[in-house]
Amino acid sequence: MINKLISNIRRTNAPIVVGLDPMLNYIPEHIQKKAFAEFGETLEGAAEAIWQYNKGIVDATYDLIPAVKPQIAMYEQFGIPGLAAYKKTVDYCKSKDLVVSGDIKRGDIGSTSAAYAVGHLGHVQVGSKKYAGFDEDFATVNPYLGSDGVKPFMDVCKEEKKGIFVLVKTSNPSSGEFQDREIDGRPLYELVGEKVAQWGDELMGDGYSYVGAVVGATYPEMGKVLRKIMPKTFILVPGYGAQGGKGAE
Protein backbone atom coordinates (compact mmCIF):
# COMPACT_ATOMS: atom_id res chain seq x y z
CA MET A 1 0.00 0.00 0.00
CA ILE A 2 2.94 2.34 0.53
CA ASN A 3 3.66 1.98 -3.17
CA LYS A 4 0.11 3.05 -4.04
CA LEU A 5 0.36 6.05 -1.72
CA ILE A 6 3.56 7.18 -3.40
CA SER A 7 2.03 6.56 -6.83
CA ASN A 8 -1.02 8.66 -5.92
CA ILE A 9 1.20 11.47 -4.64
CA ARG A 10 3.19 11.50 -7.86
CA ARG A 11 0.05 11.37 -10.00
CA THR A 12 -1.58 14.32 -8.22
CA ASN A 13 1.68 16.18 -7.48
CA ALA A 14 0.22 16.80 -4.03
CA PRO A 15 2.06 15.38 -0.99
CA ILE A 16 -0.92 16.10 1.25
CA VAL A 17 -3.66 14.22 3.06
CA VAL A 18 -7.13 15.66 3.65
CA GLY A 19 -8.35 15.21 7.19
CA LEU A 20 -11.97 14.15 7.51
CA ASP A 21 -12.48 15.16 11.14
CA PRO A 22 -16.08 16.43 11.09
CA MET A 23 -17.42 18.61 13.90
CA LEU A 24 -21.19 18.83 13.76
CA ASN A 25 -21.37 22.55 14.54
CA TYR A 26 -19.02 23.26 11.59
CA ILE A 27 -21.16 21.42 9.06
CA PRO A 28 -23.16 23.85 6.88
CA GLU A 29 -26.66 24.49 8.18
CA HIS A 30 -28.40 23.35 5.00
CA ILE A 31 -26.76 19.91 5.29
CA GLN A 32 -27.77 19.60 8.93
CA LYS A 33 -31.35 20.69 8.21
CA LYS A 34 -31.76 18.10 5.47
CA ALA A 35 -30.37 15.31 7.64
CA PHE A 36 -32.47 16.31 10.65
CA ALA A 37 -35.60 16.55 8.50
CA GLU A 38 -35.16 12.90 7.57
CA PHE A 39 -33.80 11.42 10.80
CA GLY A 40 -34.63 14.02 13.44
CA GLU A 41 -32.17 15.60 15.85
CA THR A 42 -30.80 12.18 16.73
CA LEU A 43 -27.51 10.32 16.53
CA GLU A 44 -28.71 9.00 13.18
CA GLY A 45 -29.38 12.55 12.00
CA ALA A 46 -25.94 13.70 13.08
CA ALA A 47 -24.30 10.73 11.36
CA GLU A 48 -26.19 11.43 8.14
CA ALA A 49 -25.07 15.07 8.20
CA ILE A 50 -21.47 13.97 8.72
CA TRP A 51 -21.66 11.46 5.88
CA GLN A 52 -23.16 13.96 3.43
CA TYR A 53 -20.58 16.59 4.40
CA ASN A 54 -17.73 14.13 3.91
CA LYS A 55 -19.13 13.02 0.57
CA GLY A 56 -19.21 16.61 -0.61
CA ILE A 57 -15.58 17.16 0.38
CA VAL A 58 -14.47 13.96 -1.34
CA ASP A 59 -16.43 14.73 -4.51
CA ALA A 60 -14.76 18.15 -4.69
CA THR A 61 -11.20 16.94 -4.07
CA TYR A 62 -10.72 13.27 -5.01
CA ASP A 63 -8.97 14.03 -8.31
CA LEU A 64 -6.63 16.55 -6.67
CA ILE A 65 -5.38 14.62 -3.65
CA PRO A 66 -3.73 11.25 -2.99
CA ALA A 67 -5.20 10.34 0.39
CA VAL A 68 -7.60 11.09 3.23
CA LYS A 69 -7.32 10.67 6.99
CA PRO A 70 -10.59 10.28 8.90
CA GLN A 71 -10.25 10.71 12.68
CA ILE A 72 -12.38 7.97 14.20
CA ALA A 73 -13.12 9.79 17.49
CA MET A 74 -15.18 12.36 15.63
CA TYR A 75 -17.46 9.52 14.55
CA GLU A 76 -17.35 7.39 17.70
CA GLN A 77 -18.95 10.16 19.75
CA PHE A 78 -22.15 9.54 17.79
CA GLY A 79 -22.19 5.86 18.72
CA ILE A 80 -23.07 3.12 16.26
CA PRO A 81 -24.58 5.55 13.71
CA GLY A 82 -21.35 7.53 13.81
CA LEU A 83 -19.26 4.42 13.20
CA ALA A 84 -21.55 3.53 10.30
CA ALA A 85 -20.83 6.98 8.83
CA TYR A 86 -17.11 6.33 9.32
CA LYS A 87 -17.36 3.05 7.43
CA LYS A 88 -19.38 4.64 4.61
CA THR A 89 -16.74 7.37 4.38
CA VAL A 90 -13.90 4.85 4.17
CA ASP A 91 -15.67 2.81 1.50
CA TYR A 92 -16.57 5.87 -0.57
CA CYS A 93 -13.02 7.23 -0.47
CA LYS A 94 -11.64 3.88 -1.59
CA SER A 95 -14.15 3.79 -4.46
CA LYS A 96 -12.55 7.06 -5.61
CA ASP A 97 -9.10 5.41 -5.54
CA LEU A 98 -7.96 7.43 -2.54
CA VAL A 99 -5.64 5.91 0.05
CA VAL A 100 -7.38 5.91 3.43
CA SER A 101 -5.39 6.30 6.63
CA GLY A 102 -7.56 5.62 9.66
CA ASP A 103 -6.50 7.99 12.43
CA ILE A 104 -7.28 5.57 15.25
CA LYS A 105 -4.12 5.81 17.41
CA ARG A 106 -4.58 2.34 18.86
CA GLY A 107 -2.17 1.01 21.47
CA ASP A 108 -2.61 -2.23 23.39
CA ILE A 109 -0.99 -5.66 23.58
CA GLY A 110 -1.47 -9.27 22.54
CA SER A 111 -4.89 -10.39 21.40
CA THR A 112 -6.35 -6.91 21.93
CA SER A 113 -3.82 -5.29 19.62
CA ALA A 114 -4.37 -8.09 17.12
CA ALA A 115 -8.13 -7.46 17.24
CA TYR A 116 -7.61 -3.76 16.58
CA ALA A 117 -5.32 -4.59 13.66
CA VAL A 118 -7.72 -7.12 12.15
CA GLY A 119 -10.70 -4.83 12.67
CA HIS A 120 -9.15 -1.90 10.85
CA LEU A 121 -6.71 -3.41 8.37
CA GLY A 122 -7.44 -7.11 8.06
CA HIS A 123 -10.14 -9.76 7.78
CA VAL A 124 -11.93 -11.39 10.69
CA GLN A 125 -12.83 -15.07 10.63
CA VAL A 126 -16.56 -15.82 10.89
CA GLY A 127 -17.16 -19.54 10.60
CA SER A 128 -15.74 -20.64 7.28
CA LYS A 129 -15.60 -17.10 5.86
CA LYS A 130 -13.54 -13.96 6.36
CA TYR A 131 -14.80 -10.39 6.33
CA ALA A 132 -13.13 -6.98 6.32
CA GLY A 133 -14.16 -4.68 9.16
CA PHE A 134 -13.40 -1.02 8.56
CA ASP A 135 -10.87 -1.86 5.84
CA GLU A 136 -8.63 1.21 5.90
CA ASP A 137 -5.30 1.15 4.04
CA PHE A 138 -3.22 2.57 6.90
CA ALA A 139 -3.80 3.13 10.61
CA THR A 140 -2.06 5.28 13.20
CA VAL A 141 -0.56 3.35 16.11
CA ASN A 142 0.61 4.42 19.57
CA PRO A 143 3.92 2.66 20.45
CA TYR A 144 3.87 3.40 24.19
CA LEU A 145 3.40 -0.30 25.05
CA GLY A 146 6.37 -1.33 22.93
CA SER A 147 6.70 -4.08 20.36
CA ASP A 148 3.84 -6.03 21.95
CA GLY A 149 1.49 -3.33 20.71
CA VAL A 150 3.01 -2.79 17.27
CA LYS A 151 3.92 -6.29 16.10
CA PRO A 152 0.30 -7.48 15.77
CA PHE A 153 -0.32 -4.59 13.39
CA MET A 154 2.81 -5.48 11.46
CA ASP A 155 1.64 -9.07 11.12
CA VAL A 156 -1.64 -7.93 9.56
CA CYS A 157 0.17 -5.39 7.37
CA LYS A 158 2.40 -8.13 6.02
CA GLU A 159 -0.58 -10.33 5.20
CA GLU A 160 -2.75 -7.58 3.73
CA LYS A 161 -0.03 -5.41 2.15
CA LYS A 162 -1.18 -2.44 4.21
CA GLY A 163 0.64 -0.02 6.50
CA ILE A 164 0.79 1.87 9.78
CA PHE A 165 2.00 5.25 10.96
CA VAL A 166 3.63 5.05 14.40
CA LEU A 167 3.52 8.10 16.68
CA VAL A 168 7.10 9.33 17.08
CA LYS A 169 7.03 13.09 17.73
CA THR A 170 3.53 14.49 17.79
CA SER A 171 2.47 18.06 17.01
CA ASN A 172 0.62 18.91 20.23
CA PRO A 173 2.15 21.46 22.66
CA SER A 174 2.52 19.05 25.59
CA SER A 175 4.13 16.25 23.57
CA GLY A 176 7.48 17.06 25.12
CA GLU A 177 6.32 16.05 28.60
CA PHE A 178 7.19 12.48 27.66
CA GLN A 179 8.58 12.46 24.12
CA ASP A 180 11.43 14.90 24.87
CA ARG A 181 12.54 13.21 28.10
CA GLU A 182 16.12 12.03 27.88
CA ILE A 183 17.24 8.45 28.39
CA ASP A 184 21.01 7.96 28.49
CA GLY A 185 21.42 11.45 27.06
CA ARG A 186 19.01 11.06 24.14
CA PRO A 187 15.38 12.19 23.80
CA LEU A 188 12.76 9.47 23.80
CA TYR A 189 11.45 10.43 20.35
CA GLU A 190 14.85 9.58 18.84
CA LEU A 191 14.79 6.14 20.45
CA VAL A 192 11.26 5.56 19.16
CA GLY A 193 12.41 6.70 15.72
CA GLU A 194 15.21 4.14 15.77
CA LYS A 195 12.73 1.42 16.69
CA VAL A 196 10.40 2.47 13.87
CA ALA A 197 13.30 2.23 11.43
CA GLN A 198 14.07 -1.29 12.71
CA TRP A 199 10.45 -2.36 12.41
CA GLY A 200 10.36 -0.87 8.94
CA ASP A 201 13.24 -2.98 7.72
CA GLU A 202 10.95 -6.00 8.13
CA LEU A 203 8.26 -4.58 5.83
CA MET A 204 9.80 -2.80 2.87
CA GLY A 205 8.03 -1.56 -0.24
CA ASP A 206 9.78 -0.02 -3.23
CA GLY A 207 12.17 2.26 -1.37
CA TYR A 208 9.98 3.02 1.63
CA SER A 209 8.65 0.86 4.43
CA TYR A 210 5.06 -0.06 5.20
CA VAL A 211 5.84 1.16 8.74
CA GLY A 212 5.58 4.94 8.64
CA ALA A 213 5.99 7.59 11.32
CA VAL A 214 4.01 10.54 12.63
CA VAL A 215 6.26 13.58 13.09
CA GLY A 216 4.61 16.94 13.73
CA ALA A 217 5.23 19.96 11.51
CA THR A 218 5.35 22.11 14.64
CA TYR A 219 8.82 20.75 15.47
CA PRO A 220 10.79 21.08 12.21
CA GLU A 221 14.28 20.82 13.74
CA MET A 222 13.37 17.56 15.44
CA GLY A 223 11.89 16.41 12.16
CA LYS A 224 15.24 16.90 10.43
CA VAL A 225 16.96 14.72 13.02
CA LEU A 226 14.30 12.04 12.72
CA ARG A 227 14.56 11.97 8.94
CA LYS A 228 18.23 11.01 9.31
CA ILE A 229 17.31 8.31 11.82
CA MET A 230 14.49 6.98 9.61
CA PRO A 231 15.72 7.36 6.00
CA LYS A 232 13.35 4.71 4.59
CA THR A 233 10.32 5.75 6.62
CA PHE A 234 7.38 7.56 5.07
CA ILE A 235 6.44 10.42 7.39
CA LEU A 236 2.94 11.69 8.10
CA VAL A 237 3.27 15.34 9.14
CA PRO A 238 0.33 16.72 11.15
CA GLY A 239 0.23 20.25 12.52
CA TYR A 240 0.36 22.12 9.21
CA GLY A 241 -1.76 25.28 9.20
CA ALA A 242 -4.00 25.71 12.23
CA GLN A 243 -1.46 24.25 14.66
CA GLY A 244 1.31 26.53 13.40
CA GLY A 245 3.35 24.38 11.02
CA LYS A 246 4.46 26.19 7.85
CA GLY A 247 5.35 24.89 4.40
CA ALA A 248 8.72 26.68 4.44
CA GLU A 249 9.76 24.59 7.42
What are these regions, as identified by a protein language model?
Residues 58-65, 90-95, 154-159, 227-230:
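Acidic (Asp/Glu)-rich catalytic clusters
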Residues 22-24, 72-76, 106-108, 143-145, ...:
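Active-site-proximal loop/turn and secondary-structure-junction residues that shape catalytic pockets
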Residues 217-249:
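A C-terminal functional module that forms or caps the active site or interfaces directly
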Residues 18, 68, 103, 139, ...:
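Conserved, mostly hydrophobic/aromatic
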Residues 12-16, 63-66, 96-98, 134-137, ...:
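Short, well-ordered coil/turn segments that N-cap beta-strands
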